[in-house]
UniProtKB/Swiss-Prot annotation:
Top-level division of the source organism's lineage: Bacteria
InterPro entries given in the database record: Amidohydro-rel, HutI, Metal-dep_hydrolase_composite, Metal_Hydrolase
GO molecular function: imidazolonepropionase activity; iron ion binding; zinc ion binding
Protein name per UniProt: Imidazolonepropionase
Keywords: Cytoplasm, Histidine metabolism, Hydrolase, Iron, Metal-binding, Zinc
Family: Belongs to the metallo-dependent hydrolases superfamily. HutI family.
Protein function: Catalyzes the hydrolytic cleavage of the carbon-nitrogen bond in imidazolone-5-propanoate to yield N-formimidoyl-L-glutamate. It is the third step in the universal histidine degradation pathway.
Cofactor(s) it depends on: Zn(2+); Fe(3+)
An individual GO BP term: L-histidine catabolic process to glutamate and formamide
């Protein structure tokens, strides 16, 4: 590609709507990295005569980052939605053989090609909203062959689509039916066979565990973290979603990239996360969809300076959501985040939750030129509108990969 000077734009380079430039320009090198950003009046002489692209006064933000998804799976769980409307809880449905395990059955039965095609349909609307990086977890196979198939599909999505895909091995997502009553033995399988094999195949960027009374204990979760550490892999945790089990403090002890959900997080967990630099990933779509009533401790997170990220948590059972903009709206309306917190939560802080701050979440010299173009008057509109397509253009590595006539 050729070097380009993008101009006539309003720039929010670091995901903070309180830190912007009204008349800005972005110089992008031929290799797709950013050469310079700043005021249009300050363009260095070396870039002034580069070919230009006029963005007609639109806002530019870093490409959005969806840092927690379960995008690859078989089937759907609309029947459970009806059960919840009739009064059944998430835990009750799981105890009846529904929940995660029902998706495990559908995923095990699906071919790799079928999983790929279904995942493509879920990914496309996210890309059209300006998402340029996404995390995709396994965890609906719960045995080696199916977990491998899920992670292979995630890698294929990154090859087919203009999006950076970060894979997370979530073998410790639920107890498979064949291991009923033998959770410790299943953790043996996860740590001694599944993780080593998948890591050796280059399919794993990070390791996650569902630490909850319907998931795995602290001791079992720690075994998974130890196995990840032996492989030099970063960890993250589904923690404190349904109860306060101390998972966030354990995650912090292992310097986890993130602890996610966190409705029942307490002050000790918040302090531990602050000390370890662990990002709090909040998932308002799941909170809304399962009609949770316990809010995450937003004020505690703010007071301790814990970075807050937002993600869709796309999954078939508790958050069949394919809109990061709607997630921003929910973060503001349900969790009472500010627009500033919401936008940082899907850019800079979301990148930190993936351990990818050097590549995503901010527009600075040397980083990938991944950005989204928004023909709006104020960045608050990104969280204000819902159900309305706002993104006019997506640029990935300096190349336009999506356009919509939004004016």
């Amino acid at each position: 590609m050729k070097s380009i000077l993008w101009h006539n734009l309003k720039l929010c380079a670091h995901g903070d709507p309180n830190d912007t430039i009204a008349d800005a320009a972005i110089a992008v090198n031929g290799d797709g990295t950013i050469a310079w950003t700043g005021r249009a009046s300050d363009v260095p002489a070396g870039y002034v005569h580069w070919p230009r692209e006029d963005l007609r006064g639109a806002w530019v933000t870093p490409g959005l980052v969806d840092c927690h998804t379960h995008l690859v799976y078989g089937g759907q769980r609309a029947d459970e939605f009806a059960q919840r409307l009739a009064g059944a809880s998430y835990e009750e449905i799981a105890q009846r053989g529904g929940g995660i395990v029902s998706t495990v059955r559908a995923t095990r039965d699906a071919s790799e090609a079928a999983l790929f095609e279904q995942a493509c349909a879920r990914l496309r609307p996210l890309l059209a909203e300006g998402v340029t990086a996404i995390e995709i977890k396994s965890g609906y196979g719960l045995e080696l062959a199916s977990e491998r198939r899920m992670l292979r599909v995630a890698r294929q999505l990154g090859e087919r689509f203009p999006v950076s895909v970060y894979t997370t091995f979530l073998g410790a997502h639920a107890l498979p039916p064949e291991y009923a009553g033998r959770a410790d033995e299943y953790i043996d399988e996860v740590c001694e066979r599944m993780l080593p094999a998948l890591a050796d195949e280059g399919l794993v960027d990070a390791v996650d565990v569902f630490c909850e009374r319907i998931g795995f204990t602290l001791a079992q979760s720690e075994r998974v973290f130890e196995a990840a550490a032996r492989r030099g892999l970063p960890v993250k945790m589904h923690a404190e979603q349904l109860s306060n089990g101390g998972g966030s403090a354990l995650a912090a002890r292992y310097r986890a990239l993130s602890a996610d959900h966190l409705e029942y997080l307490d002050a000790a967990g918040v302090a531990a996360m602050r000390a370890s630099g662990t990002t709090a990933v909040l998932l308002p779509g799941a909170y809304y969809f399962i009609r949770e009533t316990k809010l995450p401790p937003i004020d505690l997170l703010r007071r301790h300076g814990v970075p807050i990220a937002l993600a869709t948590d796309h999954n078939p059972g508790t958050s069949p959501l394919t809109s990061l903009l709607l997630t921003m709206n929910m973060g503001c309306t349900v969790f009472k985040l500010t627009v500033q917190e919401a936008l940082l939560g899907v850019t800079r802080h979301a990148a930190a939750a993936l351990g990818a701050s050097d590549r995503h979440g901010s527009l600075a010299p040397g980083r990938q030129a991944d950005f989204a173009v928004w023909p709006v008057s104020t960045l608050a509109e990104l969280a204000y509108w819902f159900g309305r397509p706002l993104c006019e253009r997506v640029v990935k590595g300096g190349v336009t990969v999506f356009t919509r006539d939004a004016r």
